[in-house]
């Protein structure tokens, strides 16, 4: 029992369920019986101060045998401005994992999921909220203000899809774990497939999204020198890659 060895912070609809499942295939990565991938432990931390006793309650989610490691991945942590600092208090030595995705594609996937799971009509607030989640620069600045850069691994969903074996090996090495072979088919598997009709923004909305994301994409190159913007159709369309 103790602080988590790793915490995944985001981003939503960027392949985190798939990637978390791959990490948990490692024989040294332990998950308590019945524990979900997403704990959402800090979601309501804005309501009242988080005390040291609360942080110790968080630790109780991570029992593991001697020599094993444990962690969680709650994608919503990335956008909640209060969360990186709280995780740094709870687990100052944790390895932090972030997966990013082309922001327009991430928005399309997020709205598609919402339409498939919600009975309420889509509103402009839904689009605005989904747009905000794709503004990665301020979110990553908060993460890097709370943790040293060497404790943070920022990957791209598109790179994971293109070469999952190499990206998983990089992730496992970052976590300080020995190499392993995932089960057959796990590297290619989709954890959250959808059969619903995909949301397609209108040409006007797509142009507005591109214009809205352009300044953020330019900042990302400064924050993450190794980020390959050429993997993102949005960046290519904007002439940033």
Label each PLM-derived region with a short phrase.
Residues 83-84, 108-112, 165-168:
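Short aromatic-enriched loop/helix-cap "lid" or pocket-rim segments at secondary-structure transitions
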Residues 35-37, 141-222, 226-241:
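The conserved 3'-phosphoadenosine-5'-phosphosulfate
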Residues 1-74, 78, 90, 94, ...:
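PAPS-dependent sulfotransferase catalytic core
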Residues 80-98, 137-138:
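ATP-dependent NMP and nucleoside kinases share a basic, alpha-helical "lid"
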Residues 51, 136, 213:
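Aromatic/hydrophobic pocket-lining residues that form the small-molecule binding cavity
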Residues 91-110, 133, 190-197, 201:
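N-terminal hydrophobic signal/anchor transmembrane helix of membrane proteins
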Residues 55-59, 84, 140-141, 217:
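Generic structural signal for well-ordered alpha-helices
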Residues 15-16, 58, 71, 87, ...:
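Generic structural signal for small/hydrophobic residues in well-ordered secondary structure
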């Amino acid at each position: 029992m103790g602080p988590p060895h790793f915490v995944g912070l985001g981003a939503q609809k960027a392949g985190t369920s798939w990637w978390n499942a791959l990490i948990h295939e490692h024989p040294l990565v332990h998950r308590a019986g019945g524990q979900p991938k997403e704990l959402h432990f800090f979601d309501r931390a804005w309501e009242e101060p988080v005390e040291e006793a609360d942080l110790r309650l968080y630790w109780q989610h991570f029992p593991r045998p001697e020599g094993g490691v444990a962690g969680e991945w709650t994608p919503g942590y990335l956008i909640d401005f209060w969360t990186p600092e709280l995780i740094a208090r709870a687990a100052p030595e944790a390895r932090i994992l972030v997966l990013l995705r082309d922001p327009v594609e991430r928005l399309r996937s997020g709205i598609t999921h919402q339409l498939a799971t919600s009975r309420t009509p889509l509103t402009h607030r839904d689009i605005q909220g989904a747009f905000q989640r794709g503004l990665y620069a301020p979110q990553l600045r908060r993460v890097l203000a709370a943790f040293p850069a060497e404790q943070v691994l920022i990957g791209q969903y598109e790179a994971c899809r293109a070469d999952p074996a190499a990206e998983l090996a990089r992730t496992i090495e970052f976590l300080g774990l020995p190499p392993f072979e995932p089960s057959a088919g796990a590297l290619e598997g989709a954890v959250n497939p959808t059969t619903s009709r995909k949301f397609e923004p209108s040409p006007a909305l797509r142009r507005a999204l591109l214009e809205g994301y352009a300044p953020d994409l330019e900042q990302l190159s400064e924050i993450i020198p190794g980020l390959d913007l050429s993997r993102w159709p949005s960046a290519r369309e904007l002439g940033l890659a």
